[in-house]
Regions:
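Thiamine diphosphate
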Residues: 1-104
Length: 104
């Protein structure tokens, strides 16, 4: 049985499927923030895995190989998983004091 079979209720909040547009894609807010951070020049990410910020760090980790690697395969952004939020904040402060553009 298909999911649509037997359903008669018309939702006023239904979303119609759109045709796929060439050159566009749909992302969530954390993925957009990840891409914005990469294009904004972040070169140090320290993070502690906790909802809702984990997907932001995972987005950066996903996009770095495609967008921020040198010709010899070296990344231009360090990603460090900290043991807690305080350690992550300390790493970002250290990156800033050293002239880097860090985020947590």
């Amino acid at each position: 049985m298909m999911a649509e079979e037997g359903i008669t209720w018309d939702s006023p909040h239904a979303v119609e499927a759109r045709q796929k547009k060439e050159g566009t894609f749909l992302i969530d807010g954390n993925e957009a923030a990840a891409l914005g951070s990469i294009y904004g020049g972040v070169n140090m990410l320290s993070w502690y895995p906790i909802t809702p910020s984990s997907s932001l760090a995972e987005g950066i980790i996903h996009w770095l190989p495609q967008l921020r690697e040198t010709e010899d395969g070296m990344s231009t952004c360090a990603v460090v998983q900290a043991e807690d939020e305080l350690a992550a904040a300390g790493m970002v402060l250290g990156a800033g004091w050293a002239g880097g553009r860090g985020m947590t």
